[in-house]
Amino acid sequence: MLLLALAFFFPAGDTQNVLPGKISFYGIQISTFFNHTVVENRGSGWLGDMEISSWDSEKETIIFRKPWSKGNFSNDEILEVEEIFQVYFFGFVREAQKHMSDFQVEYPFEIQVISGCEVNSHRSFDYFMRVAVKGLDLLSIKNHSCWPAPEGVSRAQEIWTLILQYKRICDTVEILLTKTCPRYLMSVIEAGKSDLQKQVKPDAWLSQGPSPGPGLLQLVCHVSGFYPKPVWVMWMRGDKELPETQKRDVLPNADETWYLRVTLDVAAEEAAGLSCRVKHSSLEGQDIILYWGHSISIGWIILAVLVPCLIVLVLFILWFYRRWSYEDIF
């Protein structure tokens, strides 16, 4: 029964340009079983790193988050797939509750499924699925091959045997992945071309983080507001990359751009001459290079603004006082 999760959002990666390499459409399902009666199903559909649809569990309908999220699918086709999901979630919950105790899974537990299809620059397709229970990988499927995760071989084999008992479901999943998904993926790529091809230049700035130890500095390079997601950021000494550079995860901003924080722990006397270099497709080869110690802190900027204002204010007070004193004499 778990395999029907493969059909999530017709099923379907980084999206850099339209078909420059690989682009995937995939659905993410998270089903949380709190007890025998309370279950929460969440789902979302993604084109590369962009969320384009989600599942409304109350209305049991698909929410399309982009004007082009339907691709070239008709309203009747949308209704048809929504009906498939409605039947699926009902059956999925029933079968999971029936069989999870057989596999010694205790409440509360969570089942996560990611599934979809991928197209490469040669327009050939692959489809895939991964299933996890309580955050532990259980099994993976790619094209017509299935293999259990090393940490759950025996349990995965038992579940796979159970799944194969539902032949009609497996046949439906295969059609959705091998026929419906490629058609949907290509149509949504074409419909969302302007969004997928957009380029947004990053902003970058330096700051000092908390000291990692006596005599040490933590240099922080912030890069924000860029799209698409792939970016290269590195601390440098001249033209030499510093392997001690520590990169965090690339995080999403609210406006669908991205943010990255890159740090370097260095002895205070060795900080001079270091720079942070940023490469991104939107920069068209004109890398951003920020030199440590050459940037002006916020405090100095504020001071530079306040000092002239204070001087003007003092001069005005002196002028007003002299004028008042002069008029008082006469």
Curated annotation (Swiss-Prot):
GO function term, MF aspect, one: exogenous lipid antigen binding
Keywords: Adaptive immunity, Cell membrane, Disulfide bond, Endosome, Glycoprotein, Immunity, Immunoglobulin domain, Lysosome, Membrane, Signal, Transmembrane, Transmembrane helix
Annotated glycan sites: N35, N72, N143
InterPro entries: Ig-like_dom, Ig-like_dom_sf, Ig-like_fold, Ig_C1-set, MHC_class-I_related, MHC_I-like_Ag-recog, MHC_I-like_Ag-recog_sf, MHC_I/II-like_Ag-recog
Chain ranges for the short sequence motif Internalization signal as given in the UniProt record: 326-329
Coiled coil: none
Note: During protein synthesis and maturation, CD1 family members bind endogenous lipids that are replaced by lipid or glycolipid antigens when the proteins are internalized and pass through endosomes or lysosomes, before trafficking back to the cell surface. Interaction with saposin C is required for the loading of bacterial lipid antigens onto CD1B in the lysosome.
Protein name stated in the entry: T-cell surface glycoprotein CD1b4
